[in-house]
Amino acid sequence: MTATQDLSFLSLISNASILVQLVLLLLLGVSLTSWTYIFSKMFAIKKARAQTEQFEKNFWSGGNLLELYQEAISNRRNATQKIGTMECIFEAGMSEYQKVKNANKASLDAGAMLDGARRAMRAAYQREMDLLESHLSFLASVGSVSPYIGLFGTVWGIMNSFRGLANVQQATLAAVAPGIAEALIATAIGLFAAIPAVLAYNRYSHEIDRLAIRFETFIEEFSNILQRQSR
């Protein structure tokens, strides 16, 4: 078997055209980056879920809200890692509630205190959700674009294969097989990059949506508690 008929994976890549090699290199880089985001997002969501469950347990244990607020402030200042999303929301709402309350001791406006706390919690919620949803758009882009990039490499490789037939007197399968094989590698790697990215995007989007519902529910429940306390 000649070198041009060697259909091993490495041989096909090394003998591919420069453009096809660039496509393969691009897809490999995109795939490695997406896998990095997949694992980092998996750990981030797992951590966010554990922190949420722990804070909910502490919040609904019947303890004093001011003590829980002081604990949240202490955790933010002393923790080597970022505090949980729900704890951030609680701290933001309680902080704003206390500021408005202390600034209007003479004439307490329950509506103003509640509105300020709710706006602060919403702002904290949006900031935290932006962090949780970071890199999801990249995974979505990889899942939708990678197959087309691979298809581009495939089309280019097949064009080169048929262009090479112009220099031979008799067209045989052996003459075009290496070129077609190298072209199909681009499609395979494109799918290899796209499929995990799509699966991860769908899974993580669902997990984050479930967390978002818990955060929004907490905002409403905590707002009701503050409303009762401000009467």
PLM region spans:
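Hydrophobic alpha-helical transmembrane segments of polytopic membrane proteins
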Residues: 183-197
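Internal alpha-helical transmembrane segments of multi-pass membrane proteins, especially GPCRs
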Residues: 14, 18, 24, 134-137, ...
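Alpha-helical transmembrane segments
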Residues: 28-48, 151, 158, 193-208
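Hydrophobic alpha-helical transmembrane segments and adjacent short intramembrane/lumenal linkers
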Residues: 169-183
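Gly/Ser/Thr-rich beta-alpha loop segments that engage phosphate groups in nucleotides
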Residues: 145, 152-155, 159, 181, ...
